Amino acid sequence: MNAPVQDAEARELALAGMRPRACAKEDARFIQGKGNYVDDIKMPGMLHMDIVRAPIAHGRIKKIHKDAALAMPGVHAVLTAEDLKPLKLHWMPTLAGDVAAVLADEKVHFQMQEVAIVIADDRYIAADAVEAVKVEYDELPVVIDPIDALKPDAPVLREDLAGKTSGAHGPREHHNHIFTWGAGDKAATDAVFANAPVTVSQHMYYPRVHPCPLETCGCVASFDPIKGDLTTYITSQAPHVVRTVVSMLSGIPESKVRIVSPDIGGGFGNKVGIYPGYVCAIVASIVLGRPVKWVEDRVENISTTAFARDYHMDGELAATPDGKILGLRVNVVADHGAFDACADPTKFPAGLFHICSGSYDIPRAHCSVKGVYTNKAPGGVAYRCSFRVTEAVYLIERMVDVLAQKLNMDKAEIRAKNFIRKEQFPYTTQFGFEYDSGDYHTALKKVLDAVDYPAWRAEQAARRADPNSPTLMGIGLVTFTEVVGAGPSKMCDILGVGMFDSCEIRIHPTGSAIARMGTITQGQGHQTTYAQIIATELGIPSEVIQVEEGDTSTAPYGLGTYGSRSTPVAGAAIALAARKIHAKARKIAAHMLEVNENDLDWEVDRFKVKGDDSKFKTMADIAWQAYHQPPAGLEPGLEAVHYYDPPNFTYPFGIYLCVVDIDRATGETKVRRFYALDDCGTRINPMIIEGQIHGGLTEGYAVAMGQQMPFDAQGNLLGNTLMDYFLPTAVETPHWETDHTVTPSPHHPIGAKGVAESPHVGSIPTFTAAVVDAFAHVGVTHLDMPHTSYRVWKSLKEHNLAL
């Protein structure tokens, strides 16, 4: 039956489709504590696993004594690498083409490495039994600094690779060398520098940090020895990839492997990889024939799961005396830890670091990245960014500030002078990226006008003129371009696995719908955002659209959620699947209204006959017809599947400004104002966008102002608890102001670019720029993170600015 004729605007509002500030559909159950996480899952006969970990960073295993643990009541098994060897599971491949030990075999490579597992009736017995397992070691020399690791006399860290002169990414120049990868035209860039009237250089270290999600990693593995089926509930950002890898490792057919990612308490890249704990729990379930749960504690999470950053970077810019950039040259030494486990594209072992030319029209550029083994935990994940983009943005933005300071130019002026102009898009960088769209000049002007930038500079000048001022004032300005939407399979496969994503939509006979995707939410608001896309495309109210993700037995194959790929890739798949349904629905509507398809117009939620608004059919009308009285020759039902492999990345951008006051007596830094303008293309739900931006800015503040993972010379991590590792609360978190421009992506079905990672990428160099700017009048060009009160106070003392 036809719905009553209503105003189109009212009907569009009722749909809660794209753009309204609709509340997140998933919020209610989380607010009420009704989420369902891995640690909430219980199964009959379930056992618990804990892990024996190495107390040293480098050493040979002489002997493992496990009899005392096995004698304890409630202990079912203690397994070591020797027990995994018959299953060929003591080593496993990494996503970077390396191999990593599941359980240490003969040698440990980093502190807290997995040495043995204990399976017991409960986690407390398992923990006690772990203490009862005694391991004898012969300690070996430890190498923590990747620069030292490349010295001729450095100890061999990966003896399993001894004698191998090439790796997955080319020649190995040293026994601790993984790869050297470069992009751009080196000869042409060197020639520019040789003749440039102005050059600047800067060394900077981007410290190792940890994503530190609220929920740690864990799984519940259940193998059915009768059916040969394996079901594993797991904290994974990419459940289908886990299914494929588990099948390859275990030999269990993929059709018999079910991976379920239930509610996940944050990922931020930390839950993309496959950790030894997952493999061990699966092995334990296969060996014992019972479900096995493993959930790591916070110390294990910070100490052993994938870190981010740890980049030693040297940047150079060549320019004219009036500030026009002529060339960029970058050399990096990247600490990959004990195993190369970075989830980077196979073609780009340094990730997408070559986005380091940023938002600027730079005629010549070259970058080189060297990956190195050390005695630290492996990782190098894309912590709330695309692969290595945070490091790239940090480098170019610091270098532009260094150049501005040398030329005595304003930081905003030099950026505007070198921006890629709107009419240059699509723009191909010297590194081969094709930026889809952008309008940097308009965005910069909007920010400078909104904050009254000249007034801030005037206040800063007055403050500097007063030698008795109790505070220093710094103004940081950053203009960044991100690359997201991993990503085109032709550019971005991981060991041959394409980076497409998928959607299946089914409209039920009564007009409600269910949609299943290959992504998995960890707080991004997928249930709301995805439903809004479908609501807009098909005219079905979002409240009757059910969104399901994370179960490989029902969801179409997809590559998961990371690198801001949900909306750019899965969102496109959703829109295109919906359009397949829309095309079929048009045929059915034409049949029902007895007109030609070309005689129909689509308006919000209905097809109507051109020139007669009283003749129309809604999607609910069409759905019933599709199932029960479809036109002759048309297959019954109303559903579609679409796999989307994007033709290009998407390139969101932003302009951020931060004003800080630094107490000259204590080094305490207070953020007076932070203004963040983001352009993520088409905006689907402003409320969710703002929430994601607030979260990214807060994590960026944590990284810039307090987070670090320092090691001593013996490889001990100094600060692997939340007593030491800075996570800001509401007390420390500054007030955020957000703004936007809209520059849709021309190749994306709905013009969306992605947003959740941009604020993290852009905010970190903005905080650093503000702190350094407070010292600029005494010639300081750079200060490494984190900008803790103590480190800032030391800089005040060093430059005779302390009171």
From Swiss-Prot:
The modification 4-hydroxyarginine is found at R384. Keywords: Copper, Hydroxylation, Metal-binding, Molybdenum, Oxidoreductase. Binds 1 Cu(+) ion per subunit. Cu(+) binds at C385. It catalyses: CO + a quinone + H2O = a quinol + CO2. GO terms for molecular function: anaerobic carbon-monoxide dehydrogenase activity; carbon-monoxide oxygenase activity; copper ion binding; iron ion binding; molybdenum ion binding. Mo-molybdopterin cytosine dinucleotide binds at E757. It holds the Pfam family MoCoBD_1. Its cofactor is Cu(+); Mo-molybdopterin cytosine dinucleotide. The keyword Plastid does not apply. It is an enzyme of class 1 (oxidoreductase). Its EC number is 1.2.5.3. Dimer of heterotrimers. Each heterotrimer consists of a large, a medium and a small subunit. NCBIfam families: CO_dehy_Mo_lg. Catalyzes the oxidation of carbon monoxide to carbon dioxide. This is Carbon monoxide dehydrogenase large chain. It comes from Hydrogenophaga pseudoflava.
